Amino acid sequence: MAKDDVIQMQGEILENLPNATFRVKLENGHVVLGHISGKMRMNYIRILPGDKVTVELTPYDLSRARIVFRTK
């Protein structure tokens, strides 16, 4: 699967949801559902409400995102 068509954006975690999903507010004001990427899951990266994150959106479904990086 090609990763050339993903859209990377910055966001902030609003709340935790079940099954390692989160409600993320993007920098443009939209609120999306985000799930943790596999590498973050393998390395036990903890994400809490208020954390700044980098998410990847696919152009096919702009209401869901993959959380790929947590900034300090």
Curated annotation (Swiss-Prot):
Localisation per UniProt entry: Cytoplasm
InterPro entries per UniProt: NA-bd_OB-fold, RNA-binding_domain_S1_IF1, S1_domain, TIF_IF1
Domain of life: Bacteria
Domain S1-like: 1-72
GO molecular function: ribosome binding; rRNA binding; translation initiation factor activity
Pfam name, any one: eIF-1a
GO cellular component: cytosol
Keywords: Cytoplasm, Initiation factor, Protein biosynthesis, RNA-binding, rRNA-binding
Spans through the membrane: none
Keyword RNA-binding part of the UniProt annotation: yes
Matches recorded under SMART domains: S1
Family classification: Belongs to the IF-1 family.
Quaternary structure, from the entry: Component of the 30S ribosomal translation pre-initiation complex which assembles on the 30S ribosome in the order IF-2 and IF-3, IF-1 and N-formylmethionyl-tRNA(fMet); mRNA recruitment can occur at any time during PIC assembly.
Biological role: One of the essential components for the initiation of protein synthesis. Stabilizes the binding of IF-2 and IF-3 on the 30S subunit to which N-formylmethionyl-tRNA(fMet) subsequently binds. Helps modulate mRNA selection, yielding the 30S pre-initiation complex (PIC). Upon addition of the 50S ribosomal subunit IF-1, IF-2 and IF-3 are released leaving the mature 70S translation initiation complex.
PANTHER family per UniProt: TRANSLATION INITIATION FACTOR IF-1, CHLOROPLASTIC
Protein name: Translation initiation factor IF-1
Taxonomic source organism: Herminiimonas arsenicoxydans
Gene: infA
